[in-house]
From Swiss-Prot:
GO terms for biological process: amino acid biosynthetic process; aromatic amino acid family biosynthetic process; chorismate biosynthetic process. Belongs to the shikimate kinase family. It comes from Chromobacterium violaceum (strain ATCC 12472 / DSM 30191 / JCM 1249 / CCUG 213 / NBRC 12614 / NCIMB 9131 / NCTC 9757 / MK). Binds 1 Mg(2+) ion per subunit. This is Shikimate kinase.
Length: 184
């Protein structure tokens, strides 16, 4: 069995929208043989409603309540990769759950890359405004300290090939003292 499949425990991806959490998460799960979850997709599956609609009807606070339940539930599982919503770290409860149940990986990218990756996505309720660049900058300034607070690994996804990035990430995970490795 290749060493990369010997990585035990949960991997939680945090970062701003467009940083690559879902894309990298899927590839990391494939590479390590783990089950992949996306907290936004899990909320949609449980409610039968799009995240943008939940934001519109219930507001951000109620969405964050749903998100906290999903994170708490999924963190109890073993050997998963979870791509969290960009704002999940705003709640101390979520930060504690993530930090105590697995390895937290902060994916960061330049504002230019984030904007390029999200500008045509109508399912980003926080960016449906006149100046999405200013909003991304504001979100970065607000959330970056929280991402850093719980991150075991920080990796830059700016202009990165997903397969190369996942390879680098697996190397860092193998070298990281922050996660358990299975023993034979």
């Amino acid at each position: 069995m290749p060493a990369m499949e010997k990585l035990a425990g949960n991997f939680f991806l945090v970062g701003l929208m467009g940083a690559g959490k879902t894309t990298v998460g899927r590839a990391l799960a494939r590479r390590t043989g783990k089950t992949f979850y996306d907290s936004d997709q899990e909320i949609e599956a449980r409610t039968g409603v799009r995240v943008a609609t939940i934001f519109d009807i219930e507001g951000e606070m109620r969405f964050r309540n749903r998100e906290a339940c999903v994170i708490r539930d999924l963190a109890q599982q073993r050997d998963i990769v979870l791509a969290t919503g960009g704002g999940a770290v705003l709640r101390e409860e979520n930060r504690k759950v993530l930090a105590s149940h697995g390895t937290v990986i902060y994916l960061r990218a330049s504002i230019d890359d984030l904007l390029a990756r999200t500008q045509h996505d109508k399912n980003r309720p926080l960016l449906q405004i006149a100046d999405p660049r200013a909003k991304l900058e504001s979100l970065f300034n607000e959330r970056d300290p929280f991402y850093r607070e719980i991150a075991d690994i920080i990796i830059d996804t700016t202009q990165q090939n997903v397969n190369l990035l996942v390879g680098r990430l697996v190397d860092q995970l193998l070298d990281s003292p922050h996660h358990p490795k299975e023993t034979d």
